[in-house]
């Protein structure tokens, strides 16, 4: 459920090169009834304006495959762990 995801201390995010790609990802994932949130891109990842999709690590493979199959261009995938007030961010390999 999105409310659980909102308060999660461990999650993944997809980043996109353009807002249009993020909006397309949102549309695709909504059509799949996926559990996700659209959030501002974390400063630890990028200082430019942008949107990211936040989701549970358990759904990484399925959501990534669905986005690729629907021709959504994903720029990066990151694992995020909250440590107090800071985020520990690890870039994951696109496959």
What are the language-model segments listed below?
Residues 61-95:
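C-terminal structural segments of small proteins and small subunits
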Residues 1, 47, 88-90:
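Terminal low-complexity, poorly structured segments
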Residues 19, 30-68:
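Amphipathic, hydrophobic secondary-structure cores in small proteins
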Residues 9-12, 48-51, 75:
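Short, surface-exposed beta-edge/turn micro-motifs
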Residues 24-30, 54, 82-86, 90-91:
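Context-gated lysine
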Residues 1-34:
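N-terminal first-folded block
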């Amino acid at each position: 459920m999105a409310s659980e995801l909102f308060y999660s201390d461990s999650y993944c995010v997809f980043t996109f090169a353009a807002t249009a790609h993020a909006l397309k990802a949102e549309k695709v994932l909504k059509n799949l009834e996926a559990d996700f949130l659209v959030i501002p891109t974390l400063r630890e990842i990028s200082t430019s304006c942008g949107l990211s999709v936040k989701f549970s690590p358990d759904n990484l493979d399925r959501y990534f495959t669905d986005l690729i199959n629907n021709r959504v261009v994903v720029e990066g995938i990151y694992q995020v762990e909250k440590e107090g007030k800071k985020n520990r961010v690890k870039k994951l390999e696109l496959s």
